[in-house]
Every structure is written in structure tokens, then in C-alpha cells.
């Protein structure tokens, strides 16, 4: 059964932080339930648990998986960021190597005993790639939607366009429906993406250490990234499956949910079929 969203505490960055999370089809005591694949959903740069809408439930129901959706610090109903917070160029690495492991531990998820499936969108996809490269034995497979593997001019230009006063105001009003404090996280996120220090950020070398299957998905109309993002994954990780979706922008799970659910089912079944 699916549980209601809740909060769990972690220690990070010298303080206690409450993280919003939700289990989907959580263990109800059925025999063999613990062996059911667990998919962890990692949201985009301005996303949250609630902003996934019902896509995680759709995917888990179709693929007969358990799911875990988490809002990172500052996002959704998690502990808000203090006003004026600014992130360094390693902000995605810190989320992957510090926050995600702490969240999994706090929730009792032992990825050493049962490797995870990670499904990340945009910044969340980058976090998934970094985590899989650092902890290859803990990841069964990756699904990355519109990932950022390096910084492109079109990404920076699209984020810069959000700074126009009327655009910013409208965006913050929409985000207020999903975040306790949208302005600090928007400012921290947009500031680092627009900083000169971040222009040379890349995870190209890290990705070569990924050992699990990867399904990399990009919309052909994505204003935040080109197909070179997922093609760079294919060059780094042998056997990567690429899915290029027409009539699809930066959010494949919103623009083409049925195609994505079908692709994940095929991807999961192929991987599970490799097991003895």
C-alpha cells in the first residue's frame, strides 16, 4: 500500500534536517516483498515529492515495484533553506554523496543487501549518476531523465530567462504550492547555475565508473539540454540505452508518461531476466 508523505530527520551540514519522503507500495508483510525492486525517485532542480504528481505511483504499479520519493533539503516540505543560502559548485556531488546516503540510512534502506533502482530527473538525474559512480555495488540500474552531465549554453540561457521580474514572480507563485519556502531554494539553485565558477562543471570522468545498466531519456524539445547530454552517458557507460522522445520537453514524465512507463518496464524486465 502507499503511505502518506512523512518526515525523517538526518544530520547534515552540521544541523538536523527534516526530509519529506513517501513510500509507494511499502512492505505490507507479504512473503517476498522485500525482494521486490525498489525505485528511488530523485526530483529536478526546482522539484519536490509533490511535483512528481502521480507518475511514481503509475510507474511502480505498472512495473510491480516499490517506490521511495524524497524531497531534498530546502525542497517541498523538507526543512527550508535559510534566506540568502548560496551553493558551491559541488552542490550536486554533496547531494549524491552525503544527503542521499544519509536519507537512505535514516529510512532503513540497505542498498548493500538489495541494490537500488534510481530514477532521477534533471538535477536529480545528475545526482543518480554521481551516486551510482561512487557506490556501484549499491545500484541495480539507473533511469535518468533530461540529465545534466556538463553545463551547456542553452541550460544557462534558459535559467537566466527565469530571472526576469515578471517570470520570476509567476514561477515563485507556482512553486509556493509545492514548497514551504520556494524563494531561498530558487535563488540558491539559479545562482549556482548562472555562476562563472560552475560553467566548467562536468561528471564525464565519474560516469566511467558506473557499472549498472542505464536508460537515458531526453526530449527532443528540451530547452534545458541537448541530446549530447545522454549521448555522453552512452560513451561513458557501455550498453546504455538511449530514448529520444518527440513532442517532449524537459520533463519526459509529464510530457510522455506512457512511453516512459513502457520503456522502464522493458528495461527492468531485461535486467531482471539476466539474474539466475
Annotate each language-model stretch with its function.
Residues 246-276:
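Catalytic active-site module of serine/aspartate enzymes centered on a nucleophile-bearing elbow/loop
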Residues 210, 216-218:
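Short beta-strand/loop motif that positions the catalytic acidic residue
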Residues 69-116:
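Active-site loop/oxyanion-hole signature of alpha/beta-hydrolase fold enzymes
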Residues 25-82:
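Conserved HGGG/HGGXW glycine-rich cap/lid loop of the alpha/beta-hydrolase fold
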Residues 112-152:
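Conserved hydrolase catalytic core segment
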Residues 189-206:
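Active-site nucleophile elbow and catalytic-triad environment of alpha/beta-hydrolase enzymes
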Residues 14-29:
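A short loop-to-beta-strand scaffold at the N-terminal edge of the catalytic core in hydrolase folds
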Residues 220-225:
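Acidic catalytic loop of the alpha/beta-hydrolase fold
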Amino acid at each position: 500500500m502507499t503511505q502518506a508523505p512523512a518526515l525523517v530527520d538526518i544530520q547534515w551540514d552540521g544541523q538536523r534536517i527534516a526530509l519529506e519522503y513517501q513510500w509507494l507500495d511499502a512492505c505490507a508483510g507479504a512473503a517476498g516483498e522485500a525482494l521486490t525492486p525498489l525505485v528511488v525517485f530523485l526530483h529536478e532542480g526546482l522539484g519536490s515529492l509533490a511535483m512528481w504528481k502521480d507518475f511514481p505511483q503509475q510507474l511502480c504499479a505498472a512495473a510491480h515495484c516499490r517506490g521511495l520519493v524524497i524531497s531534498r533539503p530546502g525542497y517541498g516540505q523538507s526543512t527550508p533553506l535559510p534566506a540568502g543560502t548560496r551553493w558551491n559548485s559541488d552542490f550536486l556531488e554533496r547531494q549524491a554523496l552525503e544527503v542521499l546516503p544519509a536519507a537512505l540510512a535514516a529510512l532503513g534502506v540497505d542498498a548493500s543487501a538489495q541494490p537500488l533502482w534510481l530514477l532521477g530527473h534533471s538535477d536529480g538525474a545528475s545526482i543518480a549518476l554521481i551516486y551510482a559512480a561512487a557506490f556501484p555495488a549499491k545500484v541495480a540500474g539507473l533511469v535518468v531523465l533530461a540529465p545534466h552531465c556538463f553545463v551547456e549554453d542553452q541550460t544557462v540561457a534558459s535559467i537566466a530567462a527565469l530571472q526576469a521580474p515578471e517570470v520570476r514572480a509567476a514561477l515563485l507563485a507556482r512553486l509556493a504550492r509545492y514548497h514551504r519556502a520556494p524563494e531561498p531554494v530558487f535563488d540558491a539553485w539559479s545562482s549556482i547555475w548562472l555562476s562563472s565558477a560552475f560553467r566548467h562543471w562536468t561528471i564525464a570522468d565519474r560516469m566511467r565508473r558506473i557499472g549498472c545498466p542505464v536508460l537515458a531519456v531526453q526530449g527532443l524539445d528540451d530547452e534545458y539540454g541537448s541530446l549530447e547530454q545522454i549521448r555522453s552517458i552512452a560513451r561513458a557507460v557501455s550498453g546504455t540505452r538511449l530514448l529520444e522522445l518527440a513532442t517532449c520537453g524537459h520533463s519526459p514524465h509529464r510530457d510522455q508518461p506512457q512511453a516512459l512507463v513502457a520503456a522502464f518496464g522493458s528495461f527492468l524486465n531485461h535486467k531482471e531476466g539476466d539474474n539466475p
